[in-house]
C-alpha cells in the first residue's frame, strides 16, 4: 500500500534565510484593534487598498488644520500603541492617518520591505483624497518606510523619529560577529535614498537610544539635503515615553508640520 504521508516542503537556502530574518525584524501583534471612535472622538475606521490586492485597516482622525500627517509605525505592535501621539497631534490641529502594515493587527499578508512600501503607498493614495497637504511621520523602521515613500511621492514635510542609515548597519551593531549583510534580504537602505529627498526634513533622536543609536540618525541627517532640522532628546532611550509622545517631541512635530503650510 502506498504511503499517504507527505514529504517535507524544503525551501531554497536563500528563501529560507529570508523567511527566518523576517521573523527577527517584524513583531506584529495578533488580532484586530478597536474602533477609531473609541480611541478619539470623531475617529473613522477606514480601509486601504494596496496594489497587490490587500485590504488594510486604518484610522483617520480629522482636525481643523490644513495639514494631515501620515504615520508609519515601527516594527512592533499595532496602531493602538501610537494612539497617544495621534491624539496629541489632532489636539494641535493636525489630521492623522494611522494604519497597520500587512500581517499586523489582523491584516492579511506577510510583512516585507517591498510589502510595507506598498502599504504606505496605499495610505498616501487614500489620504490624497482627504487632504490637500500631507506630511509623513515615521518611527524607527517606519522612518525607512516613510523616507522611501517621500522619495517616490514628496510630502509637504518628512519627520523621522529614530531613523537609521540602513537595517544592515543596525544589525552590525547588535550582532557584530554575524555576516549581517549576507543574511538580510530586507535592508532598508535609507542612506542610499535620502540624497533624493525633495522635502523639508525633521530628524528626532534619543541621546541614549540603545536600539537605533543617535549616531546612526545623525549620519542619515548629515546625508540629507537642506532644509532640515535635527533634534536630540536628552537621556531618552528608544521606547521611552518622552521619545514616543513626550511634550518636546510633539511640539517639534507640530511646529515642523505647520511650518510647511506657509507659502
What annotation goes with each model-predicted range?
Residues 197-198, 203-205, 209:
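Short beta-strand/loop motif that positions the catalytic acidic residue
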Residues 245-263:
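Catalytic active-site module of serine/aspartate enzymes centered on a nucleophile-bearing elbow/loop
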Residues 2-49:
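An N-terminal hydrophobic leader/cap segment in hydrolases
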Residues 138-142, 146:
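Gly/Ala-rich beta-loop-alpha elbow adjacent to hydrolase catalytic centers
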Residues 208-212, 239-240:
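Acidic catalytic loop of the alpha/beta-hydrolase fold
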Residues 51, 55-126:
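Membrane-embedded segments
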Residues 85, 190, 199, 213-222:
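Short alpha-helix in the alpha/beta-hydrolase fold that links the catalytic acid
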Residues 236-247:
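Catalytic histidine-centered segment of alpha/beta-hydrolase-like enzymes
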Amino acid at each position: 500500500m502506498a504511503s499517504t504521508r507527505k514529504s517535507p516542503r524544503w525551501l531554497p537556502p536563500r528563501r529560507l534565510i529570508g523567511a527566518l530574518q523576517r521573523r527577527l525584524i517584524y513583531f506584529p501583534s495578533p488580532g484586530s484593534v478597536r474602533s477609531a471612535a473609541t480611541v478619539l472622538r470623531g475617529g473613522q475606521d477606514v480601509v486601504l487598498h494596496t496594489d497587490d490586492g490587500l485590504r488594510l485597516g486604518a484610522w483617520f482622525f480629522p482636525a481643523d488644520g490644513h495639514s494631515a500627517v501620515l504615520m508609519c509605525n515601527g516594527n512592533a505592535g499595532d496602531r493602538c500603541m501610537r494612539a497617544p501621539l495621534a491624539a496629541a497631534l489632532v489636539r494641535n490641529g493636525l489630521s492623522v492617518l494611522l494604519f497597520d502594515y500587512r500581517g499586523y493587527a489582523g491584516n492579511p499578508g506577510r510583512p516585507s520591505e517591498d510589502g510595507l512600501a506598498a502599504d504606505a503607498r496605499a495610505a498616501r493614495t487614500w489620504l490624497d483624497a482627504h487632504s490637500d497637504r500631507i506630511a509623513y511621520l515615521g518611527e524607527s523602521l517606519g522612518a525607512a518606510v516613510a523616507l522611501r515613500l517621500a522619495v517616490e511621492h514628496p510630502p509637504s514635510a518628512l519627520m523621522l523619529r529614530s531613523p537609521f542609515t540602513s537595517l544592515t548597519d543596525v544589525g552590525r551593531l547588535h550582532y557584530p560577529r554575524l555576516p549581517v549583510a549576507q543574511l538580510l534580504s530586507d535592508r532598508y537602505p535609507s542612506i542610499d535614498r535620502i540624497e533624493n529627498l525633495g522635502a523639508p526634513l525633521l530628524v528626532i533622536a534619543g541621546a541614549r537610544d540603545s536600539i537605533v543609536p543617535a549616531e546612526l540618525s545623525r549620519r542619515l541627517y548629515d546625508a540629507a539635503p537642506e532644509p532640515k532640522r535635527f533634534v536630540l532628546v536628552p537621556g531618552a532611550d528608544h521606547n521611552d515615553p518622552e521619545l514616543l509622545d513626550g511634550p518636546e517631541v510633539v511640539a517639534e512635530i507640530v511646529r515642523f508640520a505647520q511650518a510647511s503650510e506657509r507659502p
